[in-house]
């Protein structure tokens, strides 16, 4: 681990888990069965579960880690190995920009989810957005052998995808406060969002 990665591990990672869990927890339906796609170490899902003990959260990832905090199954990165309408909600936290085709997984989430998709990802709009996001991704993920295709979209592109796939955007959270000041001025800005996508009945 290089010095920058050590700083990230010590000062950013725990805060990110706390902040995102607090932002995400209120967004799920009551007593929902949730699929966390790309769940990684499971710390965010675990923290959401502490805030929302009514939820039943299952993890899914292409790389199942030995330190995963929630029950996690392996998948091929393309097809979600569940029947239609298995889950009330599907969660993606900083996952889709690691895929070559985010449409594929959003379509699969629409299939296996009954009510909503909760998506945390990046908005590549803004001053030096792309190099900033690439650098953040390298620091946070490279040492875990996570794929880094840097497939970042602008909000207008996300909105077009959601419409194309039949989702309704029920809400969008921005300025999430993941980073402390002064890092927030560089790495937060409007680069992050959480979208609540409703799956039509």
Locate the predicted segments by residue.
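A short glycine-rich, Lys/Arg-flanked "PGG" loop and its adjoining helix->strand segment in the class I
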Residues: 103-117
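A conserved beta-strand element that flanks and buttresses the S-adenosyl-L-methionine
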Residues: 91
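Core SAM-dependent methyltransferase catalytic element
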Residues: 180-201
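Class I SAM-dependent methyltransferase Rossmann-like catalytic core
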Residues: 1-20
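Short catalytic micro-motifs in class I SAM-dependent methyltransferases
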Residues: 94-95
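Class I SAM-dependent methyltransferase SAM/SAH-binding core
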Residues: 41-79
